[in-house]
């Protein structure tokens, strides 16, 4: 423990890793463009520069706190310095702020307002670079890049992919894929974490809102939406509501008002996933083949395996993702003339995930050669559509989802958080339906924010070894353990994004630690209020197995990755 003096106030510190953290602990929101606590310190933007009592200036993000330090965060010299930095950044930056997708959420734009940068004294030095729209999920605009390196570090350190890097030097420096390839030509898995970390509009979501509006406007089309579990705990943040609060009912109301004919809950098909994946898992355990079973809900993880661990493709569950299952079932349901009523069905999926856009157009996710999910919009796009329509979201009354695919169990709802798939499978395996049994499963070690969690649970006289990983860098560690024979598991669950879908690449950005924890808590709270906890107790799921799915489970609910 030590004591620093910050702007004349004594501030204690303990294990804070840098001066910046201590300053923020003291209640001073010092500006940064390149600092994120989850990745390595880069120290490139210099906006967090402070001054000490000897007149020395330094970047507070890369300086360790020392007992007795005297720091000034807003001296006249420092204020001029920060303002100059922003001016220089803007001199080489695209200034089409009114039409930029990041407008209103851009950190650079916010800092320009905050620091009083109303004029730029320097000549515009920027070069015009080609915008990369090759990816099915993301758009890369080098004209808006400020070389903060956030995307590079997120891709390399959190995801272990390294699709982006720095090229050239000095004033010619740029962030780009190796050899200036298009993003779609790289090993990018479409997870969108680069977009989450990007403070400007240099990396953004490839939007499909116009396609959704076009479908809604067509009187010959029935527009059906499905809403993923993680979406419901992220939308409310944008409208000033309690962080992590589930606003599913309001989302349903908003979609109905915008013109969606039917609105269903993806937690319903998460229950289908639990049913199918559990059956597949038990079959593999019995035969002792293709273990460990690798979950296949996350398309970024699936692409990671199919690209980089090809020998383990047979280990992937053949189950479609919940998005894929529900889209296939809904399309089949409306093929019945009695249900179709002469209209073509367009399936719109509302997801927290940018990689779902890539999954939707993946040929092996089609049914009989036809695309099941026609349009994927992210949570961020949904918010823009709600705002575009002029809906006062906070005042909406909640509405229930439509039937027969509008209800999921608690096990389906928690799919949105890391460990949720495993917990739902364990609920399915247990014959004990009591609250105590559900609580015991939740406390076995599969919950929490740790990037890698290992648990062993007894089942039918054997110890089932399970690993839960979130973040592809952690997934790589786990797969290398397995590949090298260092560890053995029966089941491995992976979500590409840290903490799971609640922090997906399509979610609203700039979520602090409190927001991250609140989103997970929001899904667990939703689970707590549900009467049905187990997927195999969902009456709508059981009815579907006795009806439309009878004898067609493999056709509609499974695929292969070869």
Give the positions of each predicted feature.
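Extreme N-terminal starter segment of soluble prokaryotic enzymes
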Residues: 2-3
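Short strand-turn-strand beta-turns centered on an Asx-Gly dipeptide
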Residues: 6-9, 52-54
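Charged, low-complexity surface patches
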Residues: 12, 134, 144, 187, ...
